[in-house]
Amino acid sequence: MQNFLLATIALSAHHAWALEIDLSNVTSINAAAKTAVEHVLAIYGVGNQSVSIPGIFPDPYYWWEGGLAWDSMVRYWALTGDDTYNDLVHEALLWQTGDDFDYMPPNQTKTLGNDDQSTWALAAMTAAEYGFPSPPDVTWVQLAQNVFNTQIARWHAETCGGGLRWQIFTFNTGYNYKNSISNGNLVQLAARLALYTGNTTYSDWAQKAVEWSQDIGLISEQGQVFDGSSTNINCSTLNHVQWTSAAGTVLTGAVYAANLDRLTSADTWASLVRTLVAGSDVFTSNDILYEVACEPSHNCNVDQLAFKAILVRALANTRDLTFDHQTTASHNESIPISTNGSAVTSGSLHDSINAILRTSARAAAASCSGGADGTTCGSVWTNATWDGSYGLGQELSALEVFLANLPAKVLINANSTTGSPTTSGNGTVTTGGNGSSTSGSAVVNTNDAVVNGKGSTLALVCGLGMAVMILL
């Protein structure tokens, strides 16, 4: 049964106004993000007492999309400072952990895939990195570690030379399919755990998973990320469909791993980042993101309508975690970066990504002109108006692109002086980090330092206490 918001939208006329957003004004961006958040929570059931199981969105949304949504909600809190919904987000992230604290709740076995489980683990990692208030009995990073351990135990070398299957259980359709979203999520989870804990076991697995994807052709030399292949044919033929979700999760994993590369002066991951960004061009039209595999033909399913949110995050991560120069709160100035040691200022990676995120944010805001209040978001951003669609994926994609235009925050990792890097989970997780923790500490806010383009960079803290940016 659809909730009140969706019923209202369906019965409403299309209004002429749209969501207002001024990308030079943080207050305006915050307001746009909050509007999208309110729509997300209305779909969840907040306000009409229809939340039956914490963390789960009603039909037609699958379990994985809850993980994506709560990840966005943690980011919303961290980037806007609005803690209004923190208790609700906290409850949702913990309610779905399952008996073994590994995001395998028994009531999800009918549909549980490796990509679904890891999507929730990535939300837990976001909570750890941003210093989201820790639960009493387990830390966010322990939840992520537990998922990592269950997934590497499923690494299947007997077919295709390795890789994760899409589905966990033999009775689920897709068990005989190895896809980029499942393996890309593993790359991302491993790379983020490596940077957070300092444990090289995780970075080794990130390398192993990405090399396997490259070896069988799921990641092409041109940076394309293809959907997957069947174990029935030993992955000899690929499904060449490209999705923003798979491209996005591999890119985010590469960006985090590139920070580790920097500490050894290696360029392997940074080179992959450059290649993946180039490969993501297929998802843009005049600097506006779109889902190339289904959007032009108007046949995106419920899951696919949320995929753009994952690529938006990845592009924002790439911009914010890969530059060794000062920037501004609104990300609206040309930033010189380095490509293989040569400084470039025109057409730089930063400029091209920033253009996509800013143009897409304006386009997304224009699409948010439906529903009773004239701010419900559609799925197609290239139309400059509402396309008549509505739902969780549309709101999450818009929310992420609005958040991508806010000042970034310093993330926590093994060498941070704030936050909660930990060494173990519930006794079965991988050891890592230096054991120091101050759980629940607030992350460093870089906003004041960068308003005038002076002083601090937007960075991921790493290494010997330095602000790390990768020169791409």
Regions found by a protein language model. Give the residues of each.
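Cleavable N-terminal signal peptides of Sec/SRP-targeted secreted and luminal proteins
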Residues: 2-18, 460-467
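CBM-like carbohydrate-recognition segments
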Residues: 19-118, 127, 136, 178, ...
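Short coil/turn linking the two alpha-helices of tandem helical-hairpin repeats
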Residues: 77, 128-132, 194-198, 258-265, ...
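Extended ligand-binding groove/face enriched in aromatic
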Residues: 90-91, 95-190
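Active-site cradle of extracellular carbohydrate-active enzymes
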Residues: 183, 189-197, 201-257
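Oxyanion-binding "anion nests"
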Residues: 249-285
